[in-house]
């Protein structure tokens, strides 16, 4: 490194994998741009078509298959988190007029949801940082919604991030080029 030269913290980190097939790349980009709360049917059918098509880009198909599986898992998990939030809202009221300590059953459900979230994030390999960030962003938002409505949660809830900016490499600010 030269004196006075700029050095970017993640200049050697690839944010997205290399996909050669244009159709697979387009579906991959659509998935990464979509909200995974409720996947559109058109996106699901495009993914199935791209994954099953005959192409030389087997690596691209494998990457898209991983993203598709993650999106489906996030969609299902988001449904569970929204159900928990709605149950909590029904219990304490939308404005908190019936505030009371959480039931043991609800505390256990929150702990299981948090533990599964942390375990799922830990399952991504070093070459899947892009996917981990997307999952972290999608599920982190829902967990934060639960966290804001509850008091007395353990310090482990501090691990939940909103924007998935748990590191400088690939952070929201860096990707925006600010």
Give residue ranges: language-model regions.
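N-terminal organelle-targeting presequences
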Residues: 1-125, 129-132, 154-178
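Charged, alpha-helix-enriched surfaces in structured cytosolic catalytic cores
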Residues: 134, 138-141, 162
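Positively charged, low-complexity, intrinsically disordered RNA-binding extensions
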Residues: 142-144, 172
């Amino acid at each position: 490194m030269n004196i006075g030269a700029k050095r970017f913290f993640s200049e050697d980190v690839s944010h997205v994998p290399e996909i050669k097939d244009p159709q697979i790349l387009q579906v991959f980009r659509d998935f990464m741009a979509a909200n995974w709360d409720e996947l559109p049917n058109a996106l699901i059918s495009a993914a199935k078509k791209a994954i099953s098509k005959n192409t030389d880009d087997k690596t691209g198909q494998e990457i898209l298959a991983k993203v598709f599986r993650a999106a489906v898992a996030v969609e299902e998990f988001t449904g569970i988190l929204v159900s928990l939030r709605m149950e909590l809202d029904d219990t304490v009221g939308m404005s908190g007029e019936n505030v009371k300590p959480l039931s043991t059953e609800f505390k256990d459900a929150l702990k299981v949801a948090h533990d599964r979230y942390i375990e799922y994030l830990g399952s991504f390999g070093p070459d899947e940082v892009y996917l981990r960030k997307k999952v972290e962003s999608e599920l982190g938002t829902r967990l934060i919604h639960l966290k804001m409505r509850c008091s007395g949660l353990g310090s482990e809830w501090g691990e939940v991030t909103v924007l998935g900016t748990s590191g400088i490499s690939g952070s929201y600010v860096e990707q925006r080029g600010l």
